[in-house]
Each structure stands twice: as C-alpha cells, then as structure tokens.
Amino acid sequence: MKTVIFLGVLLTTLGCTSTTRYTQQSPEIDLVKSGISNYVNGEWEDYSSNYADGASIFFNVTEESPATIQETIASQKLSVEPFSTYAFDREKDEYEMVVTDKGETWVNFWGTWKGTLAATGEEFVIPVHLTYQFVDGKIVKAFGYWNNAEIQMTLTELAKEAEEIAANQTSD
C-alpha cells in the first residue's frame, strides 16, 4: 500500500512539473544585458564571447544576408565612430525570455539608444529591438531592428558640406 501511495505521489509530482516558458529573469537575459554593456563600453572580445561559433546575425537585414560576429563587430565599430558618446537608456530597457512550442529559447530586448554626434553635438534617440536565440547558453541567432535613417541623412549632409568646403579651398 505504501508503494502505491508513493507511486501516486511521484506520478502526480512528475505530471505537474512544467518548464518555465516565459520569464524576465534568467541567465540568458543576464548574458544579453552584459553583451549590451560590452557594446557600449567597446569590450568587443567579451561581446563576441557571448556568441556560439558560427552564429548568424541579422541586424537590419533579412535572413538571406547573415553576418558573422566578426563582421558585426566591424560594422558596429564603424557605426559608432562618428559619435562622441553613445549608450542605452538602461532605466527603460525591457527584457523577456520565452521558450517556444518547439523548445527554442529566445530573449527579447526593447531599448532606447542615444548617441551624440561629435561633429555637431546633435543627439539621436533611436528605439531598438533585439532578439536572440540561445542553445547551450550561447547565442546562435540574433536579429536586430532599428531605424538609423536620420543618422545616415545627417552624415551624408555633413560629408557633402565637407566636400563643398574642400572644393572651395582648392579653387581659391
């Protein structure tokens, strides 16, 4: 009889066990937070260590155009070069981790990037969404979406002005 009761309790306990499918606190979220800090601080080796070998990164591109972590870091270094300061507004960051019906683990991030253009002092404020797929504690896929058109237009205008100044100096 004790065995039957024990088996009943065991089966009930096992039957009620479920994995967490949604959370706002996890080691994966902590890894994303540290990766964002690494980006802001220019700690590129630490930043890249969060990614699995062969990770595919899709920042403002479709899945037909993946980048490696090395390509992504090179691109990010270039994109922040014109700025005297840049950071995320950490007080407004939002994170969540979900486990899909297929058992995939994803971390989503919503934040606000702020940067000050060195040449003009103009501040840019850009909403950012990032989502990361994790396998064995490493990022295997990353998607990122933000609109940097205003920055690009400003940089294009500054380059045009610099060309005009250079042309005027040459003709004098």
Language-model segments: which ranges?
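Sec-dependent bacterial lipoprotein signal peptides
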Residues: 1-16
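A solvent-exposed, acidic/Ser-Thr-rich amphipathic alpha-helical stretch
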Residues: 44-99, 105
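Short, solvent-exposed coil/turn segments at beta-strand boundaries
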Residues: 49-50, 102-104, 132-139
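A mature extracytoplasmic/lumenal domain signature
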Residues: 51, 61, 111-113, 130, ...
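Extracellular/periplasmic catalytic domains that process cell-envelope and extracellular macromolecules
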Residues: 100-103, 123-125
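Exposed beta-sheet edge and beta->alpha loop/turn motif
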Residues: 109-138
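Low-complexity, intrinsically disordered terminal/linker segments enriched in charged
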Residues: 141-172
